[in-house]
From Swiss-Prot:
The gene is ensa. Residues 1-37 have a biased composition (Basic and acidic residues). This is Alpha-endosulfine. The lineage of its organism: Eukaryota, Metazoa, Chordata, Craniata, Vertebrata. The modification Phosphoserine is found at S67, S109. It holds the Pfam family Endosulfine. It comes from Xenopus tropicalis (Western clawed frog).
C-alpha cells in the first residue's frame, strides 16, 4: 500500500510541475513586453508624483477647468459663509395632516380670469 501512495504523490508533483511550467510560459510574453516598454521608456516608473513642474503647479492651489467650475466653487464658498437659520416652526413638513384652518389664506388675484366671465354665458344657453 505504501508503494501506491509514493507513486501517487510522485504523479501529483509531476502534474504540479507541468502547471508551473505552463504558467511560466504564459507569463513570459507579458514579461518580455514589459521589458521592451521599460527599455523604450526608462524614466516611466521612477517618480509616482510626476515631474517637478507638475508638482509645483499642484502645490500652488486649485485651478479650474473653465469659468463654470470657478463660479460653482465660488457659490459653494458663499453658501458656507451664510449663517444657518433655525427651522421655521410654522413650516409644514409632513409630520401632521394639514387642515383647512392650517393653510394660509389664498390671495385674490387682481386680474380676473377670462374664463370666469364666460361661465355666466354658458348658464344662459
Amino acid at each position: 500500500m505504501s508503494d501506491k501512495y509514493i507513486g501517487d504523490s510522485h504523479l501529483e508533483e509531476t502534474g504540479e510541475e507541468k502547471q508551473d511550467s505552463q504558467e511560466k510560459e504564459a507569463v513570459t510574453p507579458e514579461k518580455a513586453e514589459e521589458q521592451k516598454l521599460k527599455a523604450k521608456y526608462p524614466n516611466l516608473g521612477q517618480k509616482p508624483g510626476g515631474s517637478d513642474f507638475l508638482m509645483k503647479r499642484l502645490q500652488k492651489g486649485q485651478k479650474y477647468f473653465d469659468s463654470g467650475d470657478y463660479n460653482m466653487a465660488k457659490a459653494k464658498m458663499k453658501n458656507k459663509q451664510l449663517p444657518c437659520a433655525g427651522p421655521d416652526k410654522n413650516l409644514v413638513t409632513g409630520d401632521h395632516i394639514p387642515t383647512p384652518q392650517d393653510l394660509p389664506q389664498r390671495k385674490s388675484s387682481l386680474v380676473t380670469s377670462k374664463l370666469a366671465g364666460h361661465v355666466e354665458d354658458l348658464h344662459q344657453v
